[in-house]
């Protein structure tokens, strides 16, 4: 699925009710913005401003959207270094949508310990089901399942008890 900016307007956005839903929409929009950043090479400020104009942000956790978009970009090298050992191919050979989802989810695993790791993984899978290739969600699930124990070792250990 090609995901340029015009496609993002056609993609269904979940209706937001409460903190969980507004963050889900923020993740979806942040993933699309990260995809655009990767593909078009526009500045983050331009992309963020464009997304805020082109999308209804009334049901979006705007601060979370901003943090995810800018945080992934700021920590891109660190995020990519965490992802790379868990892949079966180089980062530059990944589907760009799946790469955007993995970067977003990895950033959350690394920086947002207030969000349970299972939530991060499930949200990444859901994004891949909506925007990724046919079996993209399985790939995203596999990579995030490998990543979680190294980034959230105590939480994963406690969950498995």
Swiss-Prot record:
* Domain of life where this protein originates: Bacteria
- State the name under which the record lists this protein: Transcription antitermination protein NusB
In terms of InterPro entries, this protein maps to: NusB-like_sf (IPR035926), NusB_fam (IPR011605), NusB_RsmB_TIM44 (IPR006027)
One of the GO BP terms on file: transcription antitermination
- Identify a single GO molecular function assigned to this protein: RNA binding
The record's annotation in SUPFAM superfamilies points to: NusB-like
| Entries under Pfam families matching the protein | NusB
| Record keywords, A-Z | RNA-binding, Transcription, Transcription antitermination, Transcription regulation
Q: Does the keyword Transcription regulation apply?
A: yes
User: Which segments cross the bilayer?
Assistant: none
Purpose: Involved in transcription antitermination. Required for transcription of ribosomal RNA (rRNA) genes. Binds specifically to the boxA antiterminator sequence of the ribosomal RNA (rrn) operons.
* Family membership noted in the UniProt record: Belongs to the NusB family.
Segment Disordered: which positions?
1-20
Q: What does the entry list under GO cellular component?
A: cytosol
